[in-house]
């Protein structure tokens, strides 16, 4: 049975049901946000941080194309689109010093310490690395949020932005599935948001099993998993059913 929207009895909404794992989920697109996580040169382009740190980014182009498709469908359906950019100020104060676990675990910070010539070039606001990829351009009405850690809920206004608009459902795309996408979806789960990830609009940092493990965790414990074609079909005009 489809998981009903908590807003299903509000009246007058346009509901759609998205086929997903482990079961379908019903939601109102206008009370749903599409979250695009960290589609920056750092994570999706050769010469960016992940590439320089030794992660494979050679298969990110189809993900970018799928995100373009999902964004277009979401915008047409009246969904709020929120873009995240991960990174810090040019002096890396926001990244934290030795007293922060982020200092020790961030692969970007470790890469710069190991390769001093990269200092100031990775994930620094204003840098090429920090910029969104050329193919993905926010439009008027979209919201672009910087974030200093993996989760988009940590030290950002995301929660208040969503609650003030009555949004309870979040559809996730972006990189990396097993890091920032999963972290944000998990935090959303703890804050009572319904999270769906579009698996072919995401990409892992690390081997393929990291992608599979993240998707398993999400569909089993924290949310739902679908794909871009199914999402677009659900948002097509023939899929909507007006609530009486």
From Swiss-Prot:
It catalyses: (Z)-3-ureidoacrylate + H2O + H(+) = (Z)-3-aminoacrylate + NH4(+) + CO2; (Z)-3-ureidoacrylate + H2O = (Z)-3-aminoacrylate + carbamate + H(+); (Z)-2-methylureidoacrylate + H2O + H(+) = (Z)-2-methylaminoacrylate + NH4(+) + CO2. Induction: Up-regulated by the nitrogen regulatory protein C (NtrC also called GlnG) and repressed by RutR. Gene3D superfamilies: Isochorismatase-like. SUPFAM superfamilies: Isochorismatase-like hydrolases (SSF52499). GO terms for biological process: nitrogen utilization; uracil catabolic process. One of its GO terms (molecular function) is hydrolase activity, acting on carbon-nitrogen (but not peptide) bonds, in linear amides. InterPro entries: Isochorismatase-like_dom (IPR000868), Isochorismatase-like_hydrls (IPR050272), Isochorismatase-like_sf (IPR036380), RutB (IPR019916). Its EC number is 3.5.1.110. Keywords: Hydrolase. It holds the Pfam family Isochorismatase. Belongs to the isochorismatase family. RutB subfamily. This is Ureidoacrylate amidohydrolase RutB. It comes from Escherichia coli O6:H1 (strain CFT073 / ATCC 700928 / UPEC).
């Amino acid at each position: 049975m489809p998981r009903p929207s908590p807003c299903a009895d509000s009246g007058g909404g346009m509901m759609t049901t998205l086929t997903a794992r482990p079961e379908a989920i019903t939601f109102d697109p206008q009370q749903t946000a599409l979250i695009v996580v960290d589609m920056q040169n750092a994570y999706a382009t050769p010469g960016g941080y992940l590439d320089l740190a030794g992660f494979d980014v050679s298969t990110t182009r189809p993900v970018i194309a799928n995100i373009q498709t999902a964004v277009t469908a979401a915008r047409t359906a009246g969904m709020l689109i929120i873009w995240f950019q991960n990174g810090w100020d040019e002096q890396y104060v926001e990244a934290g010093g030795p007293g922060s676990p982020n200092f020790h675990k961030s692969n970007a910070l470790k890469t710069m310490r190991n390769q001093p010539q990269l200092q100031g070039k990775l994930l620094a606001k204003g840098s090429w690395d920090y910029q969104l990829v050329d193919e993905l351009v926010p439009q008027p009405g979209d919201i672009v949020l910087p974030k200093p850690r993996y989760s988009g809920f940590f030290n950002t206004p995301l929660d208040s932005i969503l609650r003030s608009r009555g949004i309870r459902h979040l559809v996730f795309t972006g990189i990396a599935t097993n890091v920032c996408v999963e972290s944000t979806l998990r935090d959303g789960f703890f804050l009572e948001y319904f999270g769906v990830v579009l698996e072919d609009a995401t990409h892992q940092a690390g081997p393929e099993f990291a992608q599979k493990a993240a998707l398993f965790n999400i569909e089993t414990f924290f949310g739902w998993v679908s794909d871009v074609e199914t999402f677009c079909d659900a948002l097509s005009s023939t899929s909507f059913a007006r609530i009486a």
